[in-house]
UniProtKB/Swiss-Prot annotation:
The keyword Transmembrane does not apply. Signal peptide: none annotated. The modification Phosphothreonine is found at T183, T433, T438. This is Protein SIP5. Belongs to the SIP5 family.
Length: 489
């Protein structure tokens, strides 16, 4: 029966306090009533404590049940997240075979990898459909006095991607092991605590991913250089020897011709944000018609989930974020970096004189045409506007996840607070003892004292909280299921 006193225990307790024959009957009944109240209080406390534990551990119980059925489920989920990050990193590798109008589908590397958290598949599709300017290889500077040959020579020396810092201080002394192996548990110090082991696992994974990105890009760089050398050899042979195989289909190396190189960079301009020189045409802000390169545009995104910035009244106490309603969390659209207009968006009108690469002619077959470069006009209704939400369609999912996390934390804090009031060992004992010692209360004192909630009232409050949490959990699962269904192609 646990800690609840049984009938025999109660009788023994009564025998211990049983008075002699001179002890009056009223006093004996008072002692018996006191023991009954204490026993009943202990039963309620244990029952309510169990209810609190059910509320605190309700979601964990479902997770543990699934883990009991499949011991690898949590590891699989963690591994899936790591594989998704690796797949995203592979999408950011610049490939010489993936070009559109002289640009590429992946960024040159003007910004750090951590800031490239956009949906790479969405961005690539926008570039291929020519709704967004491609990622161009930038020039640090440009001189209008450069001749055609000088400009082509400079462009020939441009790399496919910016250089990596192979000795980052962040990953100094971090083991990476064999990158060909998918697991690296042997690199983790098992003498550390579970929390420290998880931190070490995450750090090793980041270091390994960084090294993999370098290797992936270096492989593409080698392919890029090999194709350059091969095209140069073919060009020198054709200029010295008459080509009798001109009727045979030529191999597409996906490299720009000299005419395309000249066309690209002679009509370029400087991005006002990163101050690098890019070929045109640029993306243009829809609100104030200012140019912005794609490298900079993909950095712009919504603010992280936060509570509204209310005006602070110095006469009133400030409310902590943990006490606020999680449903008040918000995330405003990005503002224009030039004029601060809300809901920043850009438009892009592709060039009409150099449709090369994917969806166009081979880049090495382009012949120079002296035609004006198209410029986007935000006033034209047929030009689609692209926002930061377009390239980060999961912003609402992240906002709802943060709201759910705060709801769970708030519910846990409420349950713990009520639990502490219920299982306080001195709470019911002091109250019951005071009743037995002072059976007659001063009515004026009781009236002035604020009424304490009874055990039954607190139990009812816990039941309502449990029902509310259950309904919220069911509603969140239903919304998540509907959202996943709508996102399927």
């Amino acid at each position: 029966m646990g800690n609840v006193p049984g009938k025999i225990d109660q009788e023994d307790s009564f025998n211990d306090v049983r008075p002699d024959s001179s002890y009056n009957t009223t006093s004996s009944n008072s002692v018996i009533k006191q023991y009954d109240e204490e026993a009943s209080s202990r039963v309620r406390t244990r029952r309510t404590t169990s209810l609190v534990n059910n509320i605190l551990n309700g979601n964990n119980a479902r997770t543990k049940t699934g883990s009991h059925l499949s011991s690898t489920s949590r590891r699989k989920t963690s591994r899936e997240k790591e594989l998704a990050k690796e797949a995203h990193a592979k999408q950011l590798v610049v490939r010489c075979s993936e070009t559109v109008d002289g640009g590429f589908l992946a960024p040159f590397g003007c910004y750090s990898f951590e800031k490239l958290d956009y949906d790479a598949t969405v961005v690539k599709n926008l570039i291929i459909k020519r709704k967004l300017a491609p990622f161009y290889t930038p020039l640090q500077d440009f001189d209008e006095s450069w001749t055609r040959d000088e400009l082509i020579k400079i462009v020939d020396g441009l790399p496919l991607h910016d250089t990596f810092d192979e000795n980052l201080e962040e990953f100094e002394d971090v083991p990476i092991g064999n990158l060909r192996k998918s697991t690296f548990n042997e690199l983790i110090d098992k003498s550390l605590s579970k929390k420290e082991q998880r931190r070490m696992h995450a750090k090793i994974f980041r270091a390994r991913l960084y090294k993999k990105r370098i290797l992936w890009q270096e492989n593409e760089n080698e392919t890029f250089l090999e194709r350059k050398l091969e095209m140069k050899r073919i060009g020198s042979k054709s200029s010295n020897v008459e080509d009798n195989t001109s009727s045979q289909p030529r191999k597409n190396y996906h490299l720009p011709s000299d005419d395309l190189k000249y066309t690209l960079y002679k009509n370029g301009s400087e991005c006002p944000i990163c101050f690098l020189y890019f070929p045109g045409p640029f993306n243009y802000s829809k609100c104030c018609q200012q140019p912005i390169c794609t490298e900079c545009f993909v950095q712009i995104k919504r603010a992280d989930p936060h509570f509204p910035h209310d005006e602070v009244d110095p006469t009133e106490p400030q409310t902590n974020d943990s006490e606020k309603d999680p449903n008040l969390l918000t995330s405003e659209p990005a503002n224009c970096p030039y004029c601060a207009t809300a809901s920043f968006s850009i438009t892009y009108q592709p060039p009409t004189n150099r449709e090369t690469g994917i969806g166009g002619m081979p880049a090495d077959s382009y012949v120079y045409k002296d035609a004006a470069i198209s410029r986007a006009d935000g006033g034209q209704p047929n030009i689609p506007a692209i926002t930061s939400d377009t390239i980060r369609p999961d912003w609402e999912i992240k906002l709802n996840k943060e709201r759910a996390r705060l709801m769970r934390r708030s519910a846990n804090a409420t349950a713990i607070h009520i639990s502490n009031r219920l299982i306080d060992p001195s709470h019911s004992t002091r109250r019951n003892t005071s009743h037995s010692i002072t059976p007659i209360h001063d009515e004026s004192t009781s009236a002035s004292r604020s009424p304490e909630p009874t055990i039954n009232e607190l139990e009812d409050q816990m039941v309502r909280e449990a029902i509310r949490l259950s309904l919220e959990d069911q509603d969140n699962r239903k919304k998540s299921k509907n959202r996943n269904t709508s996102l399927r192609p």
